[in-house]
């Protein structure tokens, strides 16, 4: 079982991602440079957060054109698991592997702090270890986390159960006040139609041990391992 962690110029969350994969959920993990063209050694790929290429043009707009993203598209087409976190989510939308896109936060400020998200679909490779409706405490850290899509796309996401998480209160209520960035319908994470490519705006890799304030983030990585191996990781 081996995970590839993509690294672009400006990626800054690869070390936390490496730690949770190796030390918390116990799988092999490698850093994969943005010039790589072959992902066949890997069972899953994670695109971590950061500010790739300094967010020039817009978040993810340059990274999506890196050579490794052609390999990611081929990997996903073969059914490989791909998880994009924060900037990784933005890159996946820019690459056309997930629908929609991102705007600057509606309040015009960078947002860094704890958020709560409600599990909307617990039957995906990224949420198997979660309960439907479970509230997770996971931090956000972004200036362009405002997910938007046209009405038809938003309708399809809901009808096809492609929404993984919505921002919510600690009690699980989806309210405007619980939305840290103005995302349409409080969307915090989605999955593609085939269920193997996911993007989340909060940072699960920053919430994997109680000493950090929450261990809820490890559920996403544990879910991926469970899907790939059948091994259930206690969290």
Swiss-Prot record:
Entry GO terms, CC: cytoplasm
Gene Ontology terms describing biological process: 'de novo' IMP biosynthetic process
SMART domains per record: GATase_5 (SM01211)
Reaction it catalyzes: N(2)-formyl-N(1)-(5-phospho-beta-D-ribosyl)glycinamide + L-glutamine + ATP + H2O = 2-formamido-N(1)-(5-O-phospho-beta-D-ribosyl)acetamidine + L-glutamate + ADP + phosphate + H(+); L-glutamine + H2O = L-glutamate + NH4(+)
Primary localisation category: cytoplasm
SUPFAM superfamilies: Class I glutamine amidotransferase-like
Complexes and interactors: Part of the FGAM synthase complex composed of 1 PurL, 1 PurQ and 2 PurS subunits.
Function statement: Part of the phosphoribosylformylglycinamidine synthase complex involved in the purines biosynthetic pathway. Catalyzes the ATP-dependent conversion of formylglycinamide ribonucleotide (FGAR) and glutamine to yield formylglycinamidine ribonucleotide (FGAM) and glutamate. The FGAM synthase complex is composed of three subunits. PurQ produces an ammonia molecule by converting glutamine to glutamate. PurL transfers the ammonia molecule to FGAR to form FGAM in an ATP-dependent manner.
Protein name: Phosphoribosylformylglycinamidine synthase subunit PurQ
Lineage: Bacteria, Bacillati, Bacillota, Clostridia, Eubacteriales
